């Protein structure tokens, strides 16, 4: 197929009477590369006997364009469904420059989650690794365990409970400044700024308008290019993303230096945020994280802590507007909690534990529109799975799209039904919005806290209606309504 496409390009070029020199050079290079990689791909396919069925697609880019295209059309399942129907629940493809085996079943999820550091290790595409460098998402083995232990000390429930009142206070202030008194708002941009400000405050006490605005401008460029084909040429989205990441690191570096001075002078507390915690604590060997490690991990948590939560909160507002009976039940639960508080008293950790129905509503939103679509592993040795050979060094991909909306695991999968999560909930390894196993998202409790506190405050103040009930949700790289979810606010009397 590749060779035919190259010939087609050549035939079209011959229709030009005097093709420009640069075009001729580019065309010759393209045909040469296409033919070279066609030969390599053909040779490898013959050499890798017993691998799962599938196709590698185009040279270099593989099937990445179709993979991303399905997401941006709002149909991420299409990429996987078309291939599982043809090849089964384990198939071969090529994504972001890597031969990849995709696992599309609860059994596949369980296998990958339970074989971390045995047969597989966490391994995002190099395009992602180049952005997050020495962060938890890119490290493996002992380095990953060390980072996870340190970060989880801050993100565990026992530590987060101290921040509930702080998050509640910030949420009330955000609603007072941007929602209350408005007839209509654009939900997604407001929620992005809300979750970003929250993450900046809790992770690094970045809360002045100038610092937030400067970081925000770089971050909006950064988030658009995380899952992109890594074409690092001037003007490409990926190139802009790398420059934005460097600018964010530079700003974080200045903040780290200032915080070190403040800690030494006693003008900052070791418990005030993640940054102080990382600067004040050491690992089992008595070593502190380097400044680069701190920058990379705060960058990762700022990305994960704001973009995923704003996506979930936005689709949550959409689903509650579409399902008024669910809204009424959430409102009833939250008013009961509010009624148990003194005037002006902030929420506490114990209040979040009482928000059982509200969390089931959030879980159902995460089932239908999970913020993270899946992740990657790498085979550290050749092994057999389901009768197929998985070569050493290949990427492996698990995806929520293989289980979250499948009728085999969820009856009426398109229906919004929080009751699915009553009792024992869904079958094991079918509901995996935070992943699983040793690499399970360390921020899942942080996300839960953030979602429930916002939900408590928004339903206490408003009901709302969708301006465009038919607004489509796309995935780029996380679920987002195409027009930003404009809603009409209806304040409670």
UniProtKB/Swiss-Prot annotation:
The lineage of its organism: Eukaryota, Viridiplantae, Streptophyta, Embryophyta, Tracheophyta. Belongs to the cytochrome P450 family. It comes from the Eukaryota. Its EC number is 1.14.-.-. One of its GO terms (biological process) is sterol metabolic process. This is Cytochrome P450 716B1. The keyword Ribonucleoprotein does not apply. Its cofactor is heme. The gene is CYP716B1. The chain crosses the membrane at residues 20-40. Heme binds at residue 441. The keyword Transmembrane applies. It comes from Picea sitchensis (Sitka spruce).
